[in-house]
Amino acid sequence: MIDDILLEAEDKMDKAVEVARDELGAIRTGRANAALFQKILVDYYGAPTPLQQLAGITIPEARVILINPYDRGAASEIEKALRASDLGVNPSDDGNVIRIVLPQLTEERRREYVKLAKGKGEDARVSVRAVRRKAKDELDRIVRDGEAGEDEVARAEKELELATKSHVDAIDDLLSHKERELLEV
């Protein structure tokens, strides 16, 4: 029972780190990155469809992204979705591919993105700590109900603390890497 609680907590903490990785990857840096387009949905024949399912995304240069629609009929909808996104990009359709040239980030914009990244990192840390708190409450309940001894639960709580620390450290590493990437000119 204790092992189940620890495994479940570890699994949820892993998911929190993965969500943080995805969210930080979606924050624009000075370089082109296909992860920027993960959350863009295109209205394809009335159904919201992820951009990756409708087009191939290539990065031929550091600040240029080419989007090659599998169905040319979807090109105008893809372009519309890109303009409506919060990425601040200006796509141009040359008939074969949609080309996006990412403008150079200003210092002010870089600072805004760092602040956004820190917010997402803090959200991830909070969710890891919430998982820890829930698991600790479960362990306390087990002791109260007499289902396990205090020594076993104390050992499990130490393991839980180690898991929490390693996951928070992983989030901090992701965040510091993203900050370096954002502030690099």
UniProtKB/Swiss-Prot annotation:
It comes from the Bacteria. It is found in: Cytoplasm. GO terms for cellular component: cytoplasm. One of its GO terms (molecular function) is ribosomal large subunit binding. The keyword Cytoplasm applies. GO terms for biological process: translational termination. CDD domains: RRF (cd00520). The keyword Protein biosynthesis applies. Signal peptide: none annotated. Keywords: Cytoplasm, Protein biosynthesis. It holds the Pfam family RRF. Its main location: cytoplasm. Belongs to the RRF family. Responsible for the release of ribosomes from messenger RNA at the termination of protein biosynthesis. May increase the efficiency of translation by recycling ribosomes from one round of translation to another. HAMAP family: RRF. This is Ribosome-recycling factor. It comes from Beutenbergia cavernae (strain ATCC BAA-8 / DSM 12333 / CCUG 43141 / JCM 11478 / NBRC 16432 / NCIMB 13614 / HKI 0122). The gene is frr.
